[in-house]
A protein has these predicted regions:
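Short, charged/polar, low-complexity loop and linker segments
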Residues: 26-31, 120, 188-192
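A non-catalytic, amphipathic alpha-helix used as a structural packing/dimerization or gating element
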Residues: 41, 45-48, 52, 76, ...
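Sequence termini and other peripheral, non-core segments
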Residues: 1-9, 40, 116, 214, ...
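Active-site-proximal alpha-helical scaffolds that flank and shape metal-associated catalytic sites
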Residues: 6, 69-171, 207-210
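Acidic, carboxylate-rich catalytic segments that either coordinate divalent cations
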Residues: 192-220
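Acidic, low-complexity proline/glycine-rich segments
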Residues: 1-26, 105-109, 174-178
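Transmembrane alpha-helical segments of integral membrane proteins
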Residues: 178-187
Length: 220
């Protein structure tokens, strides 16, 4: 029986599911046990990650000009990152991060490895392979954001505006999922999907995601 894009996306997402032990920080935030300074550093790092990812997704959209389904996927991702960039300052302000500190902040290498690799994908990966890898990674990210948004309200007293950045990623993304499915299906039918490369890209994204959270837990 011929595999569908939906089956492939589900399979690879399951294969690349995070080991809960790889992220020690989100459980601490969920319990209200993470120091507020760690939340501030999270905000500072995301102030660098989000615009970088947006530009990377725009580059992937440009490189997908011959693949309209992949183009639509990466364009939608870039639009989402633009919204996230608008919402992020409220979270940073709630963490006590002032503009002067944000401007002078030196980012942590372990936190910036993820966006650096997304930028590498933007320049080197076949667009359809990148769709598959990125979609698998977003499943874990969305779960983390849902947990953090709830914890910020419950344990840290943050209001809706301060949590809106995480709410954006925590909610269902059915339209994006359908767009990813169409992009992968088109690549399957055209014979241009390299599952081995997509899996390798996905594993590296998951590893850099885990490194991001481990670095935040011990920023020094």
């Amino acid at each position: 029986m011929t595999r569908t894009a939906r089956d492939l996306l589900r399979t690879i997402t399951a294969e690349l599911a995070f080991d809960p032990r790889s992220n020690p920080l989100v459980p601490l935030i969920a319990a209200g046990e993470a120091d507020r300074e760690i939340l501030a550093v999270l905000a500072l790092e995301q102030l660098r990650v989000i615009p970088a990812d947006r530009r990377a997704f725009l580059q992937l959209a440009v490189r997908s000009s011959a693949e309209p389904e992949a183009d639509a996927f990466f364009t939608a991702l870039a639009e989402g990152e633009a919204i996230a960039q608008q919402r992020l300052p409220a979270f940073a302000a709630a963490c006590g991060v002032e503009e002067a500190r944000a401007a002078a902040y030196i980012p942590l290498p372990g936190c910036q490895a993820y966006p650096a690799y997304v930028a590498w994908l933007a320049l080197n990966a076949a667009p359809a392979d990148a769709v598959l890898a990125v979609t698998a990674n977003f499943s874990a990210w969305g779960g983390y954001c849902a947990t953090i948004a709830d914890a910020l309200r419950t344990h840290y007293g943050f209001d809706d505006e301060a949590c809106a950045f995480f709410d954006l990623f925590a909610g269902p993304a059915e339209h994006l999922d359908r767009t990813a499915e169409r992009a992968v299906q088109a690549a399957l039918e055209a014979g241009r999907l390299d599952e081995s490369s997509a899996r390798a890209y996905g594993r590296l994204l998951q590893s850099y995601e885990a490194l991001f959270w481990r670095t935040l837990e011990r920023p020094a």
